[in-house]
From Swiss-Prot:
This is Apolipoprotein N-acyltransferase. Pathway: Protein modification; lipoprotein biosynthesis (N-acyl transfer). InterPro entries: Apolipo_AcylTrfase, C-N_Hydrolase, C-N_Hydrolase_sf, LNT_N. It is a multi-pass membrane protein. SUPFAM superfamilies: Carbon-nitrogen hydrolase. Its EC number is 2.3.1.269. The active site is at 267 (proton acceptor), 334, 386 (nucleophile). The lineage of its organism: Bacteria, Pseudomonadati, Pseudomonadota, Gammaproteobacteria, Enterobacterales. Its main location: membrane. It comes from Photorhabdus laumondii subsp. laumondii (strain DSM 15139 / CIP 105565 / TT01) (Photorhabdus luminescens subsp. laumondii). Pfam families: CN_hydrolase (PF00795), LNT_N (PF20154).
Length: 509
């Protein structure tokens, strides 16, 4: 078999697609090898050339299975440890998740090869990024969405970082797809100009990476203490563990009450209903107010709404000027819930099947999409709980011109020592960069950190330690272009590219 016929072998292309897809995981934390994003997308574009739509879809499906099979297999940790099902079923569920997510690259390739079959710049650098933006949008929207492993996040430590505060992370992904297509064109048709343009797209943002779209308010620098309780997930919701959990958080907080204006506990740090803890919260609030310290804590709440009782994953503030009364006046209720973790679709059918569909606290209700900022010790904080921090448009929608900090609290203990918490942390850093605000990130077992407005890590605690992160944090002001306009400019570009590609293609036909 000669070289040309070997490269045309569908099975070989599928195997190579698996490899190129899996290599994309190296672009994300904790590996942080940002060139892997370009290599992976280059492989996807190259291997789907000169194929029928069905063949291209299968190759792209294999590419997606390589990416998501290697990049999201951390979900196995929570399924295996807390799902209560046989190992074979656990593995099957992880495979099904990767296969589902792979349908979106398959759709991308099928459409690309259906409407833009020729190997030219129109296909590779114009139509491909526009179609990719569309299919990635669908992946982040259908069935509440799972926009994990978007390649734009890989550029936090790469040369295209400066694009984030201007057009957002999705625009970086768009540009990565365009320049990878130009590299394919340069290799296939030996067009050096295409390669030069690709390198220019990659490097031109580099000189402005240190441009500040924000101003630091040095006179408002504040001391913050973030408590990392490191409570094992297997014990977190055990009623017998409640008293010990409270002792851990109180014991680590008492040295800072009266010394730190702001103390932060992580998501559901108080593993009990707020209504059950009124006495404890009232006494703690009195102590905090007397010592001029405010506490932000995660807690669960059950409230009557109409003729139903609804459970919310909440953040509340204690130590405010107004004494605490149930329910806490200054609060945030999580809006975007995680399927199976925080709510169960078709629950009457699924809950009886296995413990995985009946996890503790998996019956939450949504808060409102837009909610007031948290007012804490005279500062305004835009808040996101756990998974919500990966949803750039939701965070931006709640962001206000007078926001001084971003706040996210999380509990990644579900995923143990896997790469999942590191990917989550990377996406949280991107929100700081996009919006030009410091981020305070409080977690149960890591990664607890303070992020500067440029997305860089100011301070962080090691994972799986019981510790306190103390930091002086300077708030910021100013509006980045992304904070002002969101993804609208990118969608205008996407529609323009799509119309141009379709019109030009029709004329040529």
């Amino acid at each position: 078999m000669n070289k040309a016929s070997l490269l045309n072998c569908q099975r070989l292309r599928a195997l190579l697609a698996l490899f190129f897809g899996a290599s994309g995981t190296l672009a994300f934390s904790p590996f942080d090898f940002w060139p892997a994003a370009i290599i992976s997308l280059f492989g996807l574009q190259l291997l789907t050339l000169n194929r029928t739509p069905r063949q291209a879809a299968f190759i792209a499906f294999c590419w997606g299975f390589g990416l998501f099979g290697s990049g999201t297999n951390w979900v196995y940790v929570s399924i295996a440890n807390f799902g209560g099902m046989p190992t074979t079923v656990n593995i099957l569920l992880v495979i099904l998740l990767a296969a589902y997510l792979s349908l979106y690259p398959a759709l991308f390739a099928a459409l690309l090869n259906r409407f833009f079959a020729k190997t030219n710049g129109l296909r590779l650098a114009v139509a491909a990024p526009a179609l990719w933006q569309l299919t990635e949008f669908l992946r982040g929207w259908i069935l509440t969405g799972f926009p994990w492993l978007q390649f734009g996040y890989s550029q936090l430590d790469g040369p295209m970082k400066a694009i984030a505060p201007i057009l957002g992370v999705e625009a970086i992904t768009f540009l990565l797809m365009a320049l990878s297509g130009l590299f394919v064109l340069a290799v296939i048709h030996r067009k050096i100009v295409a390669g030069i343009i690709a390198v220019a797209i990659l490097l031109l943002p580099w000189p402005i990476r240190h441009y500040q779209w924000y101003s630091l308010l040095s006179e408002k620098t504040v001391d913050v203490a973030l408590i990392q309780g490191n409570i094992p997930q297997s014990l977190k919701w055990d009623p017998k563990m409640l008293s010990e959990t409270m002792d851990i958080y109180m014991g680590n907080s008492l040295p800072y009450i009266g010394k730190m204006p702001i103390i932060i506990w992580p998501e559901s740090a108080i593993p009990s209903l707020e209504s059950y803890q009124r006495h404890f919260l009232t006494k703690l609030d009195e102590l905090l107010r007397n010592q001029h310290t405010s506490l932000i804590t995660g807690i669960v709440d059950e409230r009557a709404v109409g003729d139903r009782d609804k459970i919310y994953n909440s953040v509340i503030v204690l130590g405010d000027k107004i004494p605490y009364q149930y329910p806490a006046a200054i609060r945030y209720d999580k809006y975007h819930l995680v399927p199976f973790g925080e709510f169960v679709p078709l629950e009457s059918l699924l809950r009886p099947l296995a413990p995985f569909f009946n996890l503790p606290m998996s019956s939450f209700s949504r808060g409102n999409y837009i909610q007031p900022q948290l007012s804490v010790a005279g500062y305004n904080l835009t808040t996101a709980i756990c998974y919500e921090i990966i949803l750039g448009e939701q965070v931006r929608a709640n962001f206000k011109p007078d926001t001084e900090f971003l706040l996210t609290v999380s509990n990644d203990a579900w995923f143990g020592g896997s790469i999942g918490p590191w990917q989550h942390f990377q996406m949280a850093r991107m929100r700081s960069l996009e919006l030009g605000r410091p981020l305070l990130r409080g977690t149960n077992n890591g990664i607890t950190a303070v992020i500067r407005p440029d997305g860089e890590v100011q301070a962080a605690l090691p994972q799986f330690t019981r510790n306190v992160l103390v930091a002086k944090v300077t708030p910021a002001t100013g509006i980045t272009p992304y904070a002002r306009w969101g993804n609208w400019p990118l969608w205008i570009i996407t529609v323009s590219f799509s119309l141009f590609a379709l019109t030009y293609n029709r004329r040529k036909s």
